[in-house]
Design a protein with these regions (language model features):
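C-terminal cap of metal-dependent C-N hydrolases
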Residues: 315, 370-435
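Divalent metal-coordination and catalytic microenvironments
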Residues: 16, 38, 49, 70, ...
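Active-site mouth loops of central-metabolism enzymes
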Residues: 48-61, 84, 89, 108-120, ...
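Alpha-helix-loop-beta-strand connector modules within alpha/beta enzyme cores
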Residues: 42, 92-108, 155-171, 328, ...
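Histidine-rich, glycine-flanked metal-binding segment
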Residues: 1-43
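Metal-associated gating/positioning segment near the N- to mid-region
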Residues: 36-105
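Histidine/acidic residue-rich metal-binding segments in metalloenzymes
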Residues: 122-137, 141-298, 314
């Protein structure tokens, strides 16, 4: 997978970098050769939305298990979200604790994101100096007490600092007023079925949150990134903002592109995420937004938990909101993309190039090109498999993908020119803990 598209080629690796890309029959003698056959050789995926949860909640997920899952899924770089670990990454001390926990455990490259919470605007400069690549905030409760939602006043405090730093603010964009209104109307005797849960997170809340963020951006221009867009209602607002040159990027996730609300079995809380999986027309509109470029990228929002936190007698309100999918994203997206006549080049643009650009790594990751890091995924675009939870590498096997037939099998993953994964076997951890280049 070259910048010009799919073509037969030989990728020459020297040390940790791609030194040369030549014709398919230009194979040098006297050096080790890996023959990928007819498989696709692509830049490794960059996943900028992963909850690893270590330290503090490593019984949910940890660096070793998450990064093994990443390597098995062709993901060569992950970015750890600032919440669900204890402490949350809202100070330099917490970032240091994260790095210490990750050291020596990572099978792929790992970067870190900082958190914006009420009252920590004074910490943001130090976090940037210490090496976070971007910041994250919630407009509604995050689900964990140590990472509270921000108000508009908190945003007004943080925006000038973020403007000075030039780093993106990644936002969980649901407007709290619309969420409160929907939940006020909810029947207290609810059994927590999926239809009720879906109604409690209305699509308009996402559109209104995007509009709120654009108003704040009017006052103080900073790069804004909308995480896990599930509602197509916001697409028209985003298109209009882009037409005016606004610095706003958008991601969606494999689960929003795979399922619709009709597919969610009653009581199957493994499908619970926030914002929720919506109707079929919405899913198709998200695909249209990807294809026309309104949505920039696809990332996992890998958010695992203890199995007991999903086993809540089918109550979607009390179950943990998060889907475990880090190992399966490439296959899930390719399965659906093929149905829409998309190519591996589209997948590379959405899952390699755009996420690398978001975090400022587009000069070294996301492409098979001279001078880029030799982070490489090799996969068979025609092979199919049925998801067997016992073969998933993340800490717990609870996932809505269990039993689903997917197309696209990752065979081999290289990290910085070193073999990290091949056909179910792993080398020793060889990932790097990333810091931004100055």
């Amino acid at each position: 997978m070259l910048p010009t598209g799919v073509a037969p080629a030989v990728v020459h690796v020297f040390g940790a970098s791609i030194a040369h890309v030549s014709a398919w029959n230009d194979v040098p003698s006297g050096v080790p050769v890996y023959d990928a056959g007819d498989r696709i050789v692509m830049a490794g995926l960059v996943d900028t939305h992963v909850h690893i949860n270590e330290p503090g909640r490593s019984d949910w997920e940890g660096f070793a298990t998450a990064t093994r899952a990443a390597a098995a899924g062709g993901v060569t770089t992950v970015f750890d979200m600032p919440l669900n670990a204890i402490p949350a990454t809202t100070s330099v001390a917490a970032l240091d604790a994260k790095r210490a926990a990750a050291t020596g455990q990572c099978y792929v490259n790992v970067g870190f994101l900082g958190g914006v919470i009420p009252g920590n605007a004074h910490e943001l400069r130090a976090l940037a100096r210490a090496g976070v690549f971007a910041f994250k905030a919630f407009l509604v409760p995050s689900g964990v007490d140590e990472f509270p939602a921000v108000s508009e006043a908190d945003l007004r405090s943080a925006f000038p600092v973020l403007a000075e730093l030039g780093l993106p603010l990644m936002v969980h964009a649901e407007h709290p007023a619309f969420i409160r209104e929907a939940n006020t109307a909810r029947d207290d005797g609810s059994r927590g079925g999926y239809a009720e849960y879906l109604a409690s997170r209305p699509a308009i809340a996402e559109q209104a949150a995007i509009e709120l963020l654009l108003r704040r951006q009017d006052e103080c221009p900073i790069p804004i990134h909308i995480v896990h867009l599930s509602s197509a209602l916001g697409l028209s607002v985003l298109r209009a903002a882009r037409a005016k040159g606004r610095r706003i990027t958008v991601e969606t996730c494999p689960h929003y592109l795979t399922w619709c609300a009709h597919d969610v079995p009653e009581g199957a809380t493994e499908y619970k995420c926030a914002p929720p999986i919506r109707d079929a027309g919405n899913r198709d509109a998200l695909w249209s937004g990807l294809i026309d470029g309104t949505i920039d990228m696809i990332v996992s929002d890998h958010s695992p938990c203890l199995p007991a936190m999903k086993d809540t007698d089918g109550n979607f309100f009390t179950a943990w909101g998060g889907i475990a999918s880090l190992q399966l994203g490439l296959s899930a997206v390719w399965t659906e993309a093929r149905k829409r006549d998309r190519s591996p080049a589209d997948v590379a643009r959405w899952m390699c190039e755009a996420p690398a650009r978001l975090v400022g790594l587009d000069r070294c990751k996301g492409h098979i090109a001279v001078g880029y890091d030799a982070d490489i995924a090799i996969w068979d675009a025609d092979a199919e498999f049925v998801v067997n939870p016992a073969r998933l590498e993340h800490r717990h096997p609870v996932t809505p993908y269990a039993g689903r037939r997917l197309r696209g099998v990752v065979n081999t993953t290289f990290i910085g020119g070193r073999l990290a994964y091949h056909d179910g076997a792993f080398s020793d951890p060889c990932g790097t803990l990333l810091v931004p280049s100055l």
